[in-house]
Amino acid sequence: MSGAEEAGGGGPAAGPAGAVPAGVGVGVGPGAAAGPAAAALGEAAGPGIPDEAGLAGARQLQEAAGDPDAPPKKRLRAAEAAEAAAAAVAAGSGKLEERLYSVLCCTVCLDLPKASVYQCTNGHLMCAGCFIHLLADARLKEEQATCPNCRCEISKSLCCRNLAVEKAVSELPSECGFCLRQFPRSLLERHQKEECQDRVTQCKYKRIGCPWHGPFHELTVHEAACAHPTKTGNELMEILDEMDQSHRKEMQLYNSIFSLLSFEKIGYTEVQFRPYRTDDFITRLYYETPRFTVLNQTWVLKARVNDSERNPNLSCKRTLSFQLLLKSKVTAPLECSFLLLKGPYDDVRISPVIYHFVFTNESNETDYVPLPIIDSVECNKLLAAKNINLRLFLFQIQK
């Protein structure tokens, strides 16, 4: 096995062998910097010599610390990291992984990426979460997203993944939060979930109400002494009733969906929300779909961010709400149930929620109702995309 293959073992898939050299060259544009991937090889300079890798990492952190647009906490963290990196370079000491930390960290959150790594045209690195967040913020502020280091334009088409850095980061050692032993980052998740003897686990009698949480190596002793298996039926009934309530709510939702699927008139279509701006002095972002036809009627969907609050880009919590509008005329009230789900080619996580409304010529639009996205991270994924693609189901209720 070659040295390059050994360095990449256990990391994320990097495609065919011919694709690796393209990932190693971090810069992708004219005048691009050598970048962190090349800097990772700076260990060849040997201990005691201030190699280019350490100097580049220290300079990068110093730039982040001096950025007037950066939040105070980030500037403080960057300053501390820059001092540590500069001291390590000056002394020519410290473990390789400690020196690589400042070189391979994300330029936004200053932490080592946990998954995909993106780079701007000048080679500055961003973890997937920060990259998506920058694009979402730019969409909310109606600005072009830029790299926080060099201010060059960034987008999904301009930026690319850096497979060399992803593989290098996956091989760096990381400490298990339970047993405090060190493992390659690519193996740490499996160790914490399946192998660590100190990982937090639950009693097998949790189904009958046992609340015990503890280290895995104590599980056998606890289960042997657990009092729940010896409880009477009456004692267990109260516990089981509470646990069944959440299950009943979930089953009620799915039973409602199955009931709707038995209706005579059902329609569904793929809808594409496109971003627009209001005509206000301070414009606000909103989304609207082109007109579409379902159940022989013409409809439009609209959506807004954080209920159209003034500065949603300043909020860490992001939500989307939507309304359904009937654009065609009806001769009688049109009673419908509807729900939005993810499209066939998207990976956004949306919980199904059924909404109900009676459409008339005088009342032809619903109130804004929440789009049941799992969390703000999923919302940022939608905002970062050029368009939002979902699937709408409409059920006409006939009396």
Swiss-Prot record:
GO cellular component: nucleus; perinuclear region of cytoplasm
Protein's cellular compartments: Cytoplasm; Cytoplasm, Perinuclear region
Biased composition (Gly residues): 1-13
Start-end of TRAF-type zinc fingers: 152-210
Annotated segments matching region Disordered: 1-20
Keyword Metal-binding: yes
Assembly mode: Interacts with LGALS3.
Name listed for the protein in its UniProt record: Zinc finger TRAF-type-containing protein 1
Main localization category: cytoplasm
Gene Ontology terms, MF aspect: zinc ion binding
Sorted UniProt keywords: Cytoplasm, Metal-binding, Zinc, Zinc-finger
